[in-house]
Regions:
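Hydrophobic faces of well-ordered beta-strands that scaffold small-molecule active sites
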Residues: 7-13, 38-42, 75-79, 135-139, ...
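Substrate-binding cleft of secreted/luminal carbohydrate-active enzymes
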Residues: 76, 244-322
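Active-site groove signature of glycoside hydrolases
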Residues: 82, 87, 107-114, 118-152, ...
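Acidic-and-aromatic substrate-binding clefts and catalytic sites of carbohydrate-active enzymes
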Residues: 12-26, 46-59, 83-87, 144-147, ...
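Boundary/entry segment of secreted carbohydrate-active catalytic domains
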Residues: 1-32, 37, 43
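Glycoside hydrolase catalytic-domain groove-lining segments
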Residues: 153-260, 311
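Aromatic-lined substrate-binding rim segments of carbohydrate-active enzymes
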Residues: 26-34, 41-98, 151-178, 221-227
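Short, acidic/polar
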Residues: 18-34, 118-126, 186-198, 272-282
Length: 322
């Protein structure tokens, strides 16, 4: 079992989510720094960096990486077509005009032009940051999953292998993180093969864990006992494979039906600070380490509304593990 004092905590920071919430990303990030996270996952958004074909703008990501370096925060960098936050696939408009970015009958990388341009973008990001202290490179987000939030669009295992090969060529000692979703329905075994494929490709596997997922405006799906047993078994398999077992998208913000950001009120049924603390403790007892909380931009938004319940809960979170 993970000794609680050795548990490492982190979060994912998304400048895109700041935009959705109407917040300045620099000011928001500076509110996150005092929380003293061990890790922060950053996102290399294709549509932000290469708005115009062949012209790359790294101003935002450069600033975020510099801030992490300044404050000795370990960096996880997510890169690819598919990176954290809606709409999952972050295509520049010029790509959407020349490629099929909505198909579900085949993998998106089946479009040779799209695959070629994506690899050019990934290579640019790798070369930009290959000498920076990136502790893990995340290739795509839920790289092999066909999740509903991405409208069933997906990438092939072969394309993920190409991206990893490209990274290893330029950063031979790089460590690879692949993220996986876990199904809440016991009869759906599709995540098992994806999990095993990911183990073969990565140094660390990050599981995205939610405990209340909306099915309509009033009802939520909650994990059954098999869900926790599967998480325990997956951890055992990762340990036996000498891979790191991370929890990388751990619910710490509301997820509500048909809401890009849930900001109509300050409290929702899908989560709470108390539920978040319970989830972190449960994952720690299952030996997942580090644990990256999902929703730091939301906590800052809450603070701006005069409510400190999330910021205070996160601030206190590390004390039991100190």
């Amino acid at each position: 079992m993970v000794k609680l004092h050795s548990l490492k905590l982190g979060t994912t920071f998304s400048q895109l989510q700041c935009h959705y919430l109407g917040m300045d990303y620099k000011k928001t990030f500076k509110e996150i720094i005092p929380l003293n996270f061990d890790y922060i996952r950053l996102c290399a958004y294709w549509n932000e960096i290469e708005k115009i074909k062949g012209k790359f703008n790294f101003i935002v990501l450069d600033w975020l990486i510099k801030q992490c370096e300044k404050h000795s925060i370990k960096i996880v960098l997510a890169v690819g077509m598919k990176t954290p936050r809606w709409p999952e696939f972050h295509f520049p408009k010029w790509i959407e005009e020349i490629c099929n970015t909505t198909r579900t009958d085949k993998s998106l990388d089946n479009d040779e032009k799209l695959a070629e341009q994506a690899l050019i973008f990934v290579k640019k990001v790798i070369k930009r940051y290959k000498n920076r202290p990136i502790c893990y490179w995340q290739i795509e987000n839920e790289a092999l999953n066909k999740v509903g939030v991405a409208n069933r669009r997906y990438l092939s295992k072969e394309f993920i292998e190409k991206e990893i090969k490209l990274l290893k060529k330029h950063v031979p000692k790089s460590k690879i993180l692949l993220t996986n979703s876990i199904n809440m329905f016991p009869l759906d075994k599709s995540d098992e093969k994806i999990f095993k494929d990911s183990i073969a490709l990565a140094d660390a596997i990050g599981i995205n864990v939610y405990t209340k997922v909306p099915i309509n405006s009033k009802h939520y799906i909650k994990p059954l006992p098999f869900f926790w047993k599967k998480l325990a078994r997956w951890h055992k398999e990762l340990t036996e494979s000498k891979k790191q077992a991370w929890a990388v998208e751990v619910q710490a913000e509301p997820w509500e039906h048909n809401k890009l950001v849930a900001v109509d009120k300050l409290e929702y049924l899908s989560t709470s600070p108390k539920a978040m603390l319970k989830l972190v403790n449960r994952l720690a007892k299952l030996n997942y380490n580090p644990i990256l909380l999902w929703g730091c931009e939301y906590w800052v938004w809450h603070k701006q509304q005069g409510s400190l319940i999330w910021i205070e809960a996160i601030s206190k979170l590390k004390k039991p593990f100190a």
